[in-house]
């Protein structure tokens, strides 16, 4: 599809009032279900304890490369000048002292610092997996390698970017009046650009889920806008009201820093929830919606798709599944895939595609019924895509399951107790 057609498609979607209202409701439900404010509070506390070990890793990486040694102080100043409130700037001195006393740390102390950092990173991954409705976490070794890669490469890229920026702005072009104005504008824009790029990378790398760039970008944009609003509001409050300084005195930096980290996490998580909602939302007309309680119908259709894919020696990715089964929502699909993986009926390959792990010819329906805990609906309701081959097979199996239940469940509840002895006097 060409870009012009895509833009036209998005324009038509925005004009569709029913779709827009449906997405708004869906987004609001996701915000409430994700409990982002509680998650941000938890991450804020763990982040405070991880600041020192994080700084140790970051500056340890820079120390390993002599070319970056001269940029350590510049990187620290850039972070604290642009991303930390002025009232909490004294934390930078405490952090520098901790780094200077690094050689005095005992083995137990270093283990505790590294453990606090790993706990924080694990909590962040769990929170993002929860937002993207991912039940299965990465293997521990893979998780550690990703953490280490992000920290080391991110640090090196940050230092290299600052070195490159310093080189570019030292060119004769930026010594003119116009060039100096452009350089000043670029430096003012740099913090927001850094925030935006980092948040996009976080959304794409941290969750155990394939996050499309077209979904990560709007989420990151929302997060950056919220962070800039928070930054402005924070500066206005601290500049006009001295309550924290009067109450806490010299210790005011700690609650201010904690509140700042909390509000920053709220911004990042709200952006993540938007990105997740954009990838999960599917507008379904009334005729294409799966009736409540008929999840087993969707499960049987899904297994039929996997059986057909196996015949052709192929697997199915999540986008393909949603395209083939339009009655499945992203949330229901994730739940079904996780359940089938848990009972080892499906597996995921290195490309992110789902494959059958066992032959369906030897899997009894009882195993699906017991393990997936899906009800067998008694009433007959219109089902989407019932007339195709997969719908006919799933509907026939569903009819066989509920046929003997109808007569049993039609009897009055009182008939169950007709053979009991009379009530005692």
Curated annotation (Swiss-Prot):
The chain crosses the membrane at residues 48-68, 105-125, 154-174, 182-202, 216-236, 250-270. It is a multi-pass membrane protein. Disulfide bonds: none annotated. It holds the Pfam family Virul_fac_BrkB. InterPro entries: UPF0761_bac, Virul_fac_BrkB. The keyword Cell inner membrane applies. GO terms for cellular component: plasma membrane. PANTHER family: INNER MEMBRANE PROTEIN YHJD, UPF0761 MEMBRANE PROTEIN YIHY. This is UPF0761 membrane protein XCV0968.
